[in-house]
Amino acid sequence: VSEISPSRLPSGRHNLPREFVVTSQRDRLLDSMAQACAEKRYAEVSVADIVSRARVSRSTFYEIFPDKEACFLAAYDAILGRFVTDLIKACDDPDLTWPEMIERGIEACLRFLAAEPAFARMCIVDMFSAGPAALERYLSAVRMIAAFVDGGRTMMPERDVVPESIAGMVIGGAAVVIRAEIVDERTEMLPEVGPDLLYAILVPYMDKEEALERSERYAERLGLVTSS
């Protein structure tokens, strides 16, 4: 079953609107790009790989995308849109404290990636070999999340105690951990690193005992440890 469930057209002649046909073909190409990258490195994926999986012609591919990179970027943009929607939904509660929002955000992020292993690999591993435009999209997403984490400085009695740059460093480190799990083919187990990531993100902004306590409660909720 396709991870993004691209619509399939009926075989043979049909009277479907042209817009519907193009949308279906485009969705299938995006899914095929992700699936191909899951099996090969981006540099090794060819247009032939993509169209054969999508069951569309090479000419159809070039009617929709000018090249392989454009298809890759479109797939990334599509999955990032869904990721951001899930993240916003998870944190959209005015009663949540900042640490609670961070925990909700981490859990939503890791569950999303675990459920979309092909796209997780494409967006977090293959971005680095897909050219400057792809890398800029990746860095933009990291900066977006870092800006959210930087809200923790408002919790500090003196905001200048924690430099603004810390958020970017923490999120960059978290991304390395996530990338390593994906490369080691542990994508479906990503939620298990959530408690450790929570501690790493919270500890620059609060007492380390409180950060550890929140991390341990998170682990208990996931069933990773049992309460004494």
Model-derived segments and spans:
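C-terminal peripheral helix-coil segments that are non-catalytic and often amphipathic
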Residues: 1-13, 111, 115, 147, ...
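Helix-turn-helix
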Residues: 36-70
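Secondary-structure edge/capping motif, primarily at the C-terminal ends of alpha-helices
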Residues: 87-94, 123-127, 178-185
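Short, amphipathic alpha-helix enriched in basic
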Residues: 20-49, 228
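Alpha-helical DNA-contacting segments of helix-turn-helix folds
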Residues: 21-24, 28, 36-37, 65, ...
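Short, structured motif recognition centered on aromatic/hydrophobic residues
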Residues: 42, 83, 99, 121-123, ...
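Hydrophobic alpha-helical connector segments
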Residues: 88-118
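Amphipathic alpha-helical packing segments from all-alpha helical-bundle domains
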Residues: 132-155, 164-176, 191-199
